[in-house]
From Swiss-Prot:
Full protein name: Ribonuclease VapC49
Essential cofactor(s): Mg(2+)
Upregulating conditions: Induced in persister cells in response to D-cycloserine.
Cited CDD domains: PIN_MT3492-like
Family to which this protein belongs: Belongs to the PINc/VapC protein family.
Domain of life: Bacteria
The encoding gene: vapC49
Amino acid sequence: MPLVYFDASAFVKLLTTETGSSLASALWDGCDAALSSRLAYPEVRAALAAAARNHDLTESELADAERDWEDFWAATRPVELTATVEQHAGHLARAHALRGADAVHLASALAVGDPGLVVAVWDRRLHTGAHAAGCRVAPAQLDP
């Protein structure tokens, strides 16, 4: 399988059991390499903490997810936030109506420069923007 770029929403699917978790796991298990912006690290930690605050995860489940996250992150090739990625993200934010973090993820994925790259994303805006920018996205479509 090709390289797969995981945004924070895709990583959360790996760490919790929810719709899309099976596909995220298959992408992780089958890819030649997993990549993501360094921005994903704090985003995922924040998402896990929010899930615990909302009582979607118990303290024990949170501890397990945080431990698993460290393992996933250690196996991920980080894409650095260079000046080029920064500037491209600014343009992508406007072109695709993206939030700042989503624009950074899309610019980071595009910076990889691999035409076979798959972008694993469950965030609706980023999914739409990545598709419009010509990326292969997984899942192919998001449920309405």
